[in-house]
């Protein structure tokens, strides 16, 4: 069908069946998701010892740059937020404010036991029991602190999740 001239009857039939729109829409989705997944720009929100492992992941041994992952300091330039460490009640408002400043589409990676569910400080009165109560989380990376390999695997899972989404 590619390269052929369609008659009006064929065009109306394909248009009614949604063939052209569906195929073109899925191609656009594929290209957009491929570009988004290959150029993730995370912003670090390091609150505790997990941030050290996040820096370790960005170093030359694991080299996130080869996956298209480059850290940004400003939330306006980032599309991924990595929350690493214990989130307190006072810090929750700042986390939400930074999340709201990020450009769409935005993704959140919760790194470590403290960010996932409060961790060791779960029963403290001043600790939020998981950053998913403040912002929507896409990927959870377990561990206390999680290894650099675990964060790298989490980022690769996020890339695969982005590739599977449908935009149109």
UniProtKB/Swiss-Prot annotation:
Binds 1 [4Fe-4S] cluster. Its cofactor is [4Fe-4S] cluster. One of its GO terms (cellular component) is respiratory chain complex I. It holds the Pfam family Oxidored_q6. It is an enzyme of class 7 (translocase). It catalyses: a quinone + NADH + 5 H(+)(in) = a quinol + NAD(+) + 4 H(+)(out). PROSITE patterns: COMPLEX1_20K (PS01150). It is found in: Cell membrane. [4Fe-4S] cluster binds at residues 49-50, 114, 144. It is a peripheral membrane protein. Keywords: 4Fe-4S, Cell membrane, Iron, Iron-sulfur, Membrane, Metal-binding, NAD, Quinone, Translocase, Transport, Ubiquinone. Coiled coil: none annotated. Its EC number is 7.1.1.-. One of its GO terms (biological process) is electron transport coupled proton transport. GO terms for molecular function: 4 iron, 4 sulfur cluster binding; iron ion binding; NADH dehydrogenase (ubiquinone) activity; NADH:ubiquinone reductase (non-electrogenic) activity; quinone binding. NDH-1 is composed of 14 different subunits. Subunits NuoB, C, D, E, F, and G constitute the peripheral sector of the complex. Belongs to the complex I 20 kDa subunit family. NDH-1 shuttles electrons from NADH, via FMN and iron-sulfur (Fe-S) centers, to quinones in the respiratory chain. Couples the redox reaction to proton translocation (for every two electrons transferred, four hydrogen ions are translocated across the cytoplasmic membrane), and thus conserves the redox energy in a proton gradient. This is NADH-quinone oxidoreductase subunit B. It comes from Wolbachia sp. subsp. Brugia malayi (strain TRS).
């Amino acid at each position: 069908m590619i390269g052929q001239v369609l008659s009006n009857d064929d065009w109306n039939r394909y248009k009614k069946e949604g063939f052209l729109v569906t195929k073109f829409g899925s191609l656009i989705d594929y290209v957009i998701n491929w570009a988004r997944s290959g150029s993730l720009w995370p912003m670090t929100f390091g609150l505790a010892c997990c941030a050290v492992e996040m820096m370790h992941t960005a170093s030359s041994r694991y080299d996130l740059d080869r996956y298209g992952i480059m850290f940004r300091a400003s939330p306006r330039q980032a599309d991924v937020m990595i929350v690493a460490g214990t989130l307190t009640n006072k810090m929750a408002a700042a986390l939400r404010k930074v999340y709201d400043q990020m450009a769409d589409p935005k993704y959140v990676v919760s790194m470590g036991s403290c960010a996932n569910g409060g961790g060791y400080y779960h029963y403290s009165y001043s600790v939020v029991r998981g950053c998913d109560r403040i912002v929507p989380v896409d990927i959870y990376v377990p561990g206390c602190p999680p290894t650099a390999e675990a964060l790298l695997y989490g980022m690769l899972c996020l890339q695969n999740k982005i590739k599977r989404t449908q935009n149109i």
